[in-house]
Amino acid sequence: SETGTGQSMYNIMDYTNTNITGTSLILERLLKSGNTIEHFILSSSRSIYGEGAYLSSNNQPVSKNLKRKIEDMKLGKFDIYCPETGNAMKAIATNEECIPNPLSFYAATKLFQEQQMNLYKEKLFRKLTIFRFQNVYGEGQSLNNPYTGLLAVFFNLANENKSLNVFEDGLESRDFIHVDDVVATIKCSIFSNNRSWDGTFNLG
């Protein structure tokens, strides 16, 4: 897949050709072959959730149509606000039942990949596992692409006594997962005969 939320907003055709058209070609070839795949694993992304889940003023989980307003951010207000009361809401864990709310073209392509695969699931796959990865890090990552190697970029800047530019109010949070843990989980899903791996899972 092409990856990177910011880049996707202006490299639209690159992301379309790779993430959407590429997936379409795989499905079309499988349909023409007449074969059924025992187990297919799709690498998706936590970005499909957008801002993720929040707790509203009446203590109800909210995830639908959440988006920070540009005018608020210009005033230094980076919270998500309750649509009913206007009060800042608290971020909570985002589970797999959270309503997707893609806020970038990249996220939209990953969600569409999931929909493509699920549409043909009964016809093509005996078992379909979709992993929605958090930020994956590990040895060998690119030091030039901040979308794939943020920790490596920060480490190298700190090692060179350079400033780490963190925007907003410094209270941002990110969930990271090491590539070894990703590989271990994928291997577990591959070598397990358990049908519980037939579904969609957050990983990170």
Report residues per predicted region.
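Short beta-strand segments
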Residues: 41-44, 130-138, 168, 200-204
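Glycine-rich "substrate-gating" loop/helix at the edge of Rossmann-like oxidoreductase active sites
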Residues: 103-106, 134-148, 168-180, 194
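Short, flexible active-site loop motifs that bind/organize anionic cofactors or intermediates
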Residues: 5, 13, 172, 203-204
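Alpha-helical substrate-binding/gating segment
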Residues: 122, 136, 152-165, 174-201
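N-terminal Rossmann-like NAD(P)+-binding domain of SDR-like oxidoreductases, especially those catalyzing
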Residues: 1-134
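Short, electropositive, low-hydrophobicity segments enriched in small/polar residues
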Residues: 10, 26, 54, 111, ...
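A general structural signal marking secondary-structure boundaries and capping sites
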Residues: 7, 30, 34, 52, ...
